[in-house]
């Protein structure tokens, strides 16, 4: 593979691009402002679709873009137009954010040159790369999903000039918060340069999430005004305190959208090669965005691998989350867990030890692939999300299903006899209702998105505790608080990796909006001054307990087998009376209570779950030489007092005379 992009030497810059269908390619050189084209030079063919040109006298900091000419026949997937300035697919930096304009989508000869509308690629000498260190994150840890801009936009302790940027994540106040939650790794929602969907600007809206990239390496200047160095420094600062960094990357589509979308980069260079097409020439839309990246094309495959290696080598990230990951595994249109790209990622010497997380669905044929990725890929587990919500909503017959989810979802991840779960357990994520909204809204409230509430999922498996949305009724407020505690406790008690979305630990709300991608405003910005500090303290106590009791974060499936030489089963499932759940209990559709008793050589942990609305006294089995104590001091109740309805309590069994494991304030 030829080296693509801009390679800087002491004598000048070598520019290289690839296109299998273009007849001519140029590089346009701009002045230091990026506003004036000062030279347009034709690249020379080097065979197999590669074009290159060495330009003497240019130095780091030079601004440029590509242009391509060839047939223009959109009905056949050919979009060549030399009036369209194109971002280098290998751009590591662009000089300004993208902004949608109708001329970017104009047909050939219908609009003026687009150079004035386009960011320019900056030829940069990459900063000195940090040493490549093993990932800090290990399966079973806590992933903290966050939107860089929304997370610190309103944080009072972060300097104004840093708010909403990657650099803010290294601020001491942010690090302290992450440490209190026991965060193993932050998962940054997309930080690469993206463009608004064309319907948003007329509505006065903008894309707040970033899942609409143009190219894959260049960081968004709004999120990383300091460029790659800013990301590198932040990753290093977080690593210094034991927190890894995972990047959420979008390789399934780009912001060039459908046939009515803008021509920004890949479309103008070789639309037929970079995107998947139907036999009639139309774009395949397995993503719901108008196009689908052709990850089975060798040049695209290498570009994805180069991007991943870039962020490992240059920024030191722990790993990646892959949005709509089945697209990466589609070969000739069908998903294959052994597809060349997935196999290459898993076996690449730079990438093979990284954290790899798949969102295991897209909207294409057979797009739901939960459990079908191969190790080492972890997978977002939406069945966990839905089943936990159903249990706490009060659905009948959910006790057995809840136990399976708590135990690592062996029905999903043990199909091939794997010994450990690859589940990423979560109850709420960026896409959907927040944790607080799950217990306050029965239906979505997306009118602010400008689509007459048509967007977003309709089945949220949520409940409102008696009133839809805001209320001043104390009883409803308390019920919602209790439900959030119960949901958090269930998550932290679950085997395998867990994920918490930023702000859910202190009751953030989006006012019922379950698709807030277009709300770059107070709907998504975290309100640090109005957070529920009692809920936050409870989340911190849960984190401390999970760290103190390894059985909670172990990724091995719970099977009721003895733990090592202790003879104590790894799990026992009990009724509230302390007796093993019999088949009739498992099949009792009215049952909403159970105890998960985790075994350990030095003592057991009891997770007592009361999903009923009525309080109940729970009884735990006693052992000579051991004593049950509250595992979290804020739940300091004895076993003679009833466990309140819709709550979870933790008791730890220690040898007589020893203290408990977890603390909370």
Kindly give the residue locations of the regions a language model identified.
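Carbohydrate-interacting/catalytic domains
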Residues: 1-144, 149, 178, 471, ...
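Conserved, mostly hydrophobic/aromatic
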Residues: 17, 66, 146, 188, ...
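Short, flexible loop/turn elements at secondary-structure junctions
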Residues: 19, 45-47, 57, 70, ...
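Short, polar loop/linker segments at the starts of domains and inter-domain junctions
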Residues: 38-41, 155-172, 441-446, 637-643
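Core domains of carbohydrate- and sulfate-ester-processing enzymes
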Residues: 68-129, 198-206, 212, 241, ...
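Hydrophobic faces of well-ordered beta-strands that scaffold small-molecule active sites
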Residues: 142-144, 186-188, 245-247, 320, ...
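Substrate-binding/active-site clefts of carbohydrate-active enzymes
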Residues: 147-317, 324-350, 412
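Conserved alpha/beta catalytic core and glycan-binding cleft of carbohydrate-active enzymes
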Residues: 331, 337-502, 506-507, 515-519, ...
């Amino acid at each position: 593979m030829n080296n693509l992009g801009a390679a800087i030497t002491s004598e000048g810059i070598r520019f290289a691009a690839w296109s299998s269908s273009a007849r001519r390619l140029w590089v346009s050189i701009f002045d230091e402002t990026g506003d004036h084209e000062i030279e347009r030079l034709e690249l020379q063919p080097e065979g197999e679709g590669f074009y290159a040109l060495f330009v003497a006298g240019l130095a780091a900091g030079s601004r440029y873009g590509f242009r391509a000419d060839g047939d223009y026949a959109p009905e056949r997937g050919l979009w060549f137009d030399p009036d369209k300035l194109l971002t280098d697919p290998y751009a590591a930096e662009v000089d300004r954010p993208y902004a949608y304009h109708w001329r970017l989508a104009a047909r050939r000869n219908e609009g003026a040159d687009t150079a004035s509308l386009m960011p320019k690629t900056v030829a940069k000498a990459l900063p000195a790369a940090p040493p490549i260190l093993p990932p800090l994150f290990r399966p079973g840890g806590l992933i903290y999903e966050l939107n860089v801009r929304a997370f610190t936009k309103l944080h009072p302790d972060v300097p104004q000039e840093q708010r909403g940027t990657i650099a803010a994540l290294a601020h001491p106040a942010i690090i302290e918060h992450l440490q209190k939650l026991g965060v193993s790794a932050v998962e940054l929602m997309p930080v690469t340069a993206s463009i608004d969907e064309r319907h948003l600007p007329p509505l006065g809206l903008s894309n707040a999430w970033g899942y609409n990239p143009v190219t894959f390496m260049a960081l968004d200047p709004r999120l990383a005004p300091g460029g790659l160095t800013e990301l590198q420094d932040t990753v290093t600062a977080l690593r210094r305190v034991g927190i890894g960094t995972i990047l959420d990357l979008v390789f399934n589509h780009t912001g060039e959208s459908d046939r009515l979308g803008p021509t920004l980069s890949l479309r103008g260079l070789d639309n037929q090669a970079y995107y998947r097409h139907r036999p009639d020439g139309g774009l395949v839309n397995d993503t719901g965005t108008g196009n689908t990246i052709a990850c089975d094309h060798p040049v695209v495959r290498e570009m994805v691998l180069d991007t991943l290696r870039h962020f490992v080598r240059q920024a030191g990230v722990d790993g990646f989350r892959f949005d709509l990951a089945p697209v990466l595994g589609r070969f000739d249109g069908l998903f294959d867990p052994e597809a060349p790209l997935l196999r290459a990622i898993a076996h690449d010497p730079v990438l093979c030890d990284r954290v790899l997380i798949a969102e295991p669905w897209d909207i294409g044929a057979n797009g739901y692939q939960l459990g079908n990725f191969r190790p080492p890929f972890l997978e977002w587990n939406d069945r966990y999300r839905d089943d936990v919500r159903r249990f706490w909503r009060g659905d009948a017959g959910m006790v057995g299903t809840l136990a399976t989810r708590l135990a690592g979802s062996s029905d999903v991840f043990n199909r091939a006899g794997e010994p450990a779960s690859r589940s990423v357990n979560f109850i709420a994520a960026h896409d959907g209702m927040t944790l607080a909204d799950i217990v306050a809204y029965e239906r979505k409230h997306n009118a602010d998105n400008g689509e007459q509430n048509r967007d977003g999922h309709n089945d949220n498996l949520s409940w409102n505790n008696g009133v839809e949305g805001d209320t001043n009724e104390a009883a409803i407020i308390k019920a919602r608080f209790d439900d959030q505690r119960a949901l958090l406790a269930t998550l932290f008690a679950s085997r395998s990796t867990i994920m918490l979305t930023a702000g859910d630990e202190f009751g953030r709300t989006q006012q019922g909006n379950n698709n807030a991608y277009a709300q770059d405003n107070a709907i998504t910005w975290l309100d640090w001054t109005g957070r529920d500090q009692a809920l936050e303290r409870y989340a911190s106590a849960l984190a401390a307990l999970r760290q103190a009791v390894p059985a909670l974060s172990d990724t091995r499936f719970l099977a009721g087998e003895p733990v090592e030489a202790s003879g104590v089963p790894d799990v026992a499932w009990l009724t509230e009376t302390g007796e093993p759940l019999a088949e009739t209990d498992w099949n009792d559709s009215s049952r909403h209570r159970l105890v998960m008793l985790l075994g350990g050589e030095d003592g057991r942990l009891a997770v007592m779950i009361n999903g009923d609305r009525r309080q109940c006294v729970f009884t735990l089995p006693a052992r000579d030489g051991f004593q049950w104590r509250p595992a979290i001091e804020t739940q300091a109740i004895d076993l003679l007092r009833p466990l309140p309805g819709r709550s979870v309590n933790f008791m730890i069994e220690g040898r007589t005379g020893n203290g408990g494991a977890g603390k909370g304030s």
